[in-house]
């Protein structure tokens, strides 16, 4: 995994990869499903969608590092922000999404892709939530595309 850090640092001319947690880096590099990555890219390109991070990873990684992770799969250009880390709705990530939307009233269409916080997202964002149980599969992609095209 140390070799992976060196390889990515050289490939992207970015020494930040040398300081990244090697297990997180390996998870992004090896474990992200290529088909799911392509589906996410397709959503971004087809619908001119942007990615706003609400992942728990933002709790210990700044946005610049998250972009570096996404860069490995050429998705960094779609990352435009992150939700605030303010706990509302009983410490739910859905509350953070609500705050982000309140702070960005120009957003008229959005989809939430998540593998957790199901109860809260289904309660507060039933029309925008796509539960990705394991990866962004074809059925979940179709649901997300339908939401973004409505």
Predicted regions and their residues:
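Alpha-helical substrate-recognition element adjacent to the catalytic core
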Residues: 1-87
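C-terminal cap/substrate-recognition subdomain and adjoining C-terminal extension
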Residues: 64-150
